[in-house]
Amino acid sequence: MKKILISVMLFAACVFAVSAQEKEKEVKKGWSFGVLPTATFSVDNGFQAGAFGDVYNYGDGNTYPDPLHKFSWEVSYFTKSQRMRFYLAYDSKYLIPNMRVNVSATYVRDPLYSFWGFNGGASLAGLANPYDLWTNKDVNSNYFGINYYGMSRNMLRILANVQGRIVPHLNWAAGINFWNWQVGDMKDTGFKVKGDNDKHYYDKTSTLYRDYVALGIISADEAAGGNALELNAGLVFDTRDIEAAPNRGIWAEAYLNGNVLAHQYLKACVYFRHYVDIPIHIKAGDPVFAYRLAWQQTIAGQTPLYMIQNVPLLVQRNMISEGFGSSNTIRGLRENRILTEGFAWLNTELRVKIVNFKLFNQFFYIAVNPFFDAGIITKAARAQAFERAKTANAATFLPLSSIYDASKVGDIVYSAGAGLKIAMNQNFIISAEFAKCFYKPLDAGLWIGIGINYQF
């Protein structure tokens, strides 16, 4: 998959280099459509089939490269995890004068969702190779395969966020997000084992999810899911010249985010992003050094199982905003590998445009972005529950000593890699990134992430 993607992108660069004299800064008017098949692959979920895209309305071009209105959508299915995703979103800074409106609806069905436990490297620390127990189809003595990290979840999310101007570049922000979660054992449809025509299944009783419930780390009133109604409010400081891929400016947010239904909690969220233009005058555009400093922590209450993976955002850049690990935070880690109550992280990358060109009356550029990511847990999840579990008299598939080591909670996680981007009209950006985690307990080999947009 990696070789095919790189070949296609290099071919595009060669074919259209003759048009590299075209300037991206030309004005785009009217409607613009970006539609692509979701022919991607990830280690966590397998191949993705479906389609996604953005629809932009630039009006008379006075706001270009920012659109007057933006619609985003996706319909897709993943072959390995059998995940289904449906997504529709709208974003505009011009629908209501001096206000930004962002609304979306999302449905995700995850029959084979991977739950890696709480607190990152502390989870599964006693296992020589935790990934031996991940979707292992070799039949054991009970005629079952082992997917120790398997569980299921269905999610419905409806959100609406607004921002209004206080003074130039400083906005107030507020929003409301509704979630409905149904979680439980894997919903396994069966699989074939080489040399055997019978259909086999994963053992639903031998999972980390079941062990956490038995040990009391996951309580009975959250084990099957529930509803959440999150309210958020805060401030946004924004001096970016372009939203999708800034050349210069600062984008900072500070806000509180809390659930007012069952399992109430309150989180503090701080994000600081800085984009620095490097005056090396490449024909396609100056390189940009970009970095993000971020911190999210529960300051009151306890986040339930079904919400702990969420990374609250005032404006959605991607369909799913979750997971310390994977494309949203620390690249090179498995999806949602770090589930905790507090986390601080750093992302740095150098964005270099290689070539720009015009095709079918659309403006394109190709860029690369080498990057380095790092993060650390600032507040562990369920620390008291893990202490109580040491004396729990419960039948589990693996003992607590094999699946948790509290001494690793404070370890620094870091990774590095590089990405390739193709952008249309400076807004519709196809992204392919490759990374490696250098913190051994969370190293799972080469990570591949293919999707849309820069990470931040």
Sequence positions of predicted segments:
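Residues that define the transmembrane beta-barrel architecture of outer-membrane proteins
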Residues: 31-33, 45-49, 82-86, 152-158, ...
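Predominantly the C-terminal beta-signal and adjacent terminal strand-loop region
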Residues: 293-295, 421-456
